[in-house]
């Protein structure tokens, strides 16, 4: 009896479970090795599924289950520290043009949905932390503390602290991985995220955002009175990945206490969310991407190759697209009917990096820009965020098209029925209700500069609050 091609998936989160569902569609054998004891732990996190990730989930029979447990976003209300606010219809515009709503739900619930669709649950092994990978001529071996697993391809879906990425570096020729790549990730921001329940004044379908100096707060509502929130703060300096800061529960608590008076809406303060908080965590926000995604029979996807901030909401969606490209490449290589040699494996993995690296670079740049714009990092961004951004009304929805447009699809499953034909981005902008011609934008820029120079009433410079926040990190 001939040996079947097997994929060893390191990590049983979004990317790992999505890949398992794809491999089941392709009738390709796999094993998932998840270091945690629970495949869907409650860590206080939420997840945003965007229209570039939704079609793949739709093809896998997952999105209907997601849609049943969300409150679709319809519009956003963005507030500034001087009390000014404006509303944007960007969530409704995006849903109308792509056929899928922006969907927020508990990360735990999303993982439960993915896991419920797995047919061969006996192939999912929890409590199995990979500690070493051996690459042989025609196969690979993954060793955990007490077991070993053999296969023909290792996929690192194991997050930012990826053991698979470390093993790719270890197995590479001397000098192949540069010092620049090893230090590609850096940390300038941190995030306190949490889930609250029963917060009065938070309306279904409305995103609340506060763009303050050095602090950004985003709030999304879910089913059954759940409220998901993120507090993104700029920390005291830039850290490298190898020297990134660690945060305690007390750090997070003190930061949230210091923000209680911040108004998110006319009748909702951050203190209202904090008083009803069920669970919260704090984490540094790594930013950046790696150039080397694979070597031999090892490959990385998702957070193992790029890190984005929550501001752009693309971490999970980019991972889902990675999986779609990898699964399509395996489908075209017809690995189910034979064992591919090293050259054929390299061809498959090269398709992934060639397709996804350009999108990664673009999205990382957009994430970095948006994070700093929303935090008012520097006088020019403060001016743009306060005066230019509101004047554009719904036009920023069109800029989202650059990330969402051209989302990957599975070639071996029927096309998603509800996905709509993509529109030209410029035509989309013209159709928006809040369209502002380019010359007017220039006038607004000049007006903003004059207003700032004449009155000095733009956002305050670092205050006692800002100093307090930074002192905790």
UniProtKB/Swiss-Prot annotation:
Its EC number is 1.-.-.-. GO terms for molecular function: FAD binding; monooxygenase activity. Its cofactor is FAD. FAD binds at residues 34, 48, 107, 303, 316. Keywords: FAD, Flavoprotein, Membrane, Monooxygenase, Oxidoreductase, Signal, Transmembrane, Transmembrane helix. Pathway: Secondary metabolite biosynthesis. Residues 1-22 form the signal peptide. Disruption phenotype: The disruption of the whole terpendoles biosynthesis cluster abolishes the terpendoles production. GO terms for cellular component: membrane. The chain crosses the membrane at residues 441-461. It comes from the Eukaryota. InterPro entries: FAD-bd (IPR002938), FAD/NAD-bd_sf (IPR036188), FAD_mOase_fung (IPR050562). It holds the Pfam family FAD_binding_3. It is found in: Membrane. The keyword Oxidoreductase applies. It is a single-pass membrane protein. Disulfide bonds: none annotated. It is an enzyme of class 1 (oxidoreductase). Belongs to the paxM FAD-dependent monooxygenase family. FAD-dependent monooxygeanse; part of the gene cluster that mediates the biosynthesis of terpendoles, indole-diterpene (IDT) mycotoxins including terpendole I, terpendole K, terpendole C, as well as the kinesin Eg5 inhibitor terpendole E. Terpendoles biosynthesis begins with the synthesis of geranylgeranyl diphosphate (GGPP) by a yet unidentified GGPP synthase. This is FAD-dependent monooxygeanse terM. It comes from Tolypocladium album.
